[in-house]
């Protein structure tokens, strides 16, 4: 069983007292037995109902005992006086006398301070979680450790479980709280206006004794058993500052109202505080002086509930307890070992008085709480409504802000999603472009490799073509030189042909003149022959003289022959020969008659034949000249055609070389190759002679 589920035990007085506890009582004394009743902790029940007085003991309420309202809305708040322990004056020093009626008497209703002094509150002994009650063992007046529950087995405490582990025999017969707070939808916290105040003096004395285990049964007879029962009832109180204790009655504010506590020990907080030092009364008698023993208990005179600020009341109460202790011993000034403990009847009477005072206090507290319950409920309801309104406003504002934040987050998320989609698309596009560029680079690398191979193949071919071009250029220059020589020869031949043509014209003209002379000579010969025939017929032969001799004819002709050409000379010689033959013929004719005429005719025929042969020779020579001219023209046409073809092939080769060089430069620039390319100026300078040659060849 957990400590929170333990049953709290409250004190109860029953009459008559048990004879086996205290034995015979003197006449006039009413013995009382202290019994603890279990009270179950219930959040729906008022914890203060456990200390409600019996109906027979309740008297008319004292106006001074009414408590002021706790809430700020209730007026006429006043403090109620509390009766401290041991302040009764009735009875004097008689230890067996009882006080008068509890509702009257000046000793029972003394004025007390309105606040609980924190230095006078007694801390109850704490309860061990897994063991017996603390304070179950104590020391007697002789300094010996005595168990409060040991010795006697008549009560059967040795075989019983500790009280904190016992199940309650019957639930407490208490009424529920007022129904004013039951209308709330949620359970409200029952406030309590009092807190336990811990005194300093008795707390320091209480801690002098270390916690010890309870090894003896709790039903032992005598004072030790009584003090053990008191210790058990006292150890059920909360240990310093629990939420279920009672606060100062003067602090009438809602801030001093603690919440419910789940422990069961809060019901006995006022009683345990007032009875916590009873077990030390017998041991404190040795410290009193020889003057009646009143001053011996002055240092231990603490108030039961922390409100005994009057030193005289405490001294009188403790002095009476000391007197009871000294009466048993017979001498208050005896040593501590010789002192006898106080009588049980005095202790019971003192406990009964204190219990009655506590009941009165509880009743006053109950009445004050009932009076202030409406105000507290109203304040709590107002505060609850205000809190609900604030909570609704906060919820509305927070919901609006959350919606705004959600919308912003949604828009931001949508924007981020769009950006992510765009980035993914850009990434895919860039990847495709990168793949395409990689493929293009690979293709270009392959093309560059092929171009490099072609270039490696073209270089020797280009060298060969260059050598061939140089060789062809040399051949062309040689052919041009030969052409120039042939052109010079042809021009010389042409000039000779022109001279020959002029000579032929001159020969033809001279030949016509000779023919004309020959015709004139023939006419003159015929006329002379006719005249001769006439003269011959008239004159005698002896009288006839010879004509001009051939020598006379040849002499004037030799002077002219030096100025004539070969053909003219030939013609002149032929003419001279013909003239000579004519002279001879004439001579023969003259000499011989008709025979000379026939010879002349034969000579003329021969000369005509020679002339025809000469004409045929000239015709053959003209035909040979024409053939030579034709052959020369054909050769010239062939040379020009060859030059044209050579120039065309050279131009085509040049263009092909330029195209190859341009392709090599383009591929070198694309592939990043550093192949040196010839400059344009060098190409122009290298091919300038071919251009001049082409011009010269076209001018021919």
Swiss-Prot record:
Keywords attached to this entry: Cell projection, Coiled coil, Cytoplasm, Cytoskeleton, Phosphoprotein, Synapse
Domain of life from the UniProt record: Eukaryota
Transmembrane segments: none
Annotated region described as Disordered, given as residue ranges: 1-20, 40-121, 133-188, 202-344, 662-700
Any Gene Ontology CC annotation: synapse
Phosphoserine found at: 343, 345
UniProt-listed Pfam families: Fez1
UniProt-annotated location(s): Synapse; Postsynaptic density; Cell projection, Dendritic spine; Cell projection, Dendrite
Coiled coil region boundaries: 345-523, 597-666
Biased segments, Gly residues type: 322-333
Listed Low complexity bias regions: 248-265, 301-321
One biological process term in Gene Ontology: regulation of dendritic spine morphogenesis
Compositionally biased residues, Polar residues: 203-216
Biased composition (Basic and acidic residues): 109-121, 680-700
Keyword Phosphoprotein: yes
InterPro entries: LZTS (IPR045329)
Function: May be involved in promoting the maturation of dendritic spines, probably via regulating SIPA1L1 levels at the postsynaptic density of synapses.
Family: Belongs to the LZTS3 family.
Subunit text: Interacts (via C-terminus) with SHANK3 (via PDZ domain). Interacts (via coiled coil) with SIPA1L1. Can form homooligomers.
Protein name, UniProt field: Leucine zipper putative tumor suppressor 3
Organism: Mus musculus
Gene assigned in the entry: Lzts3
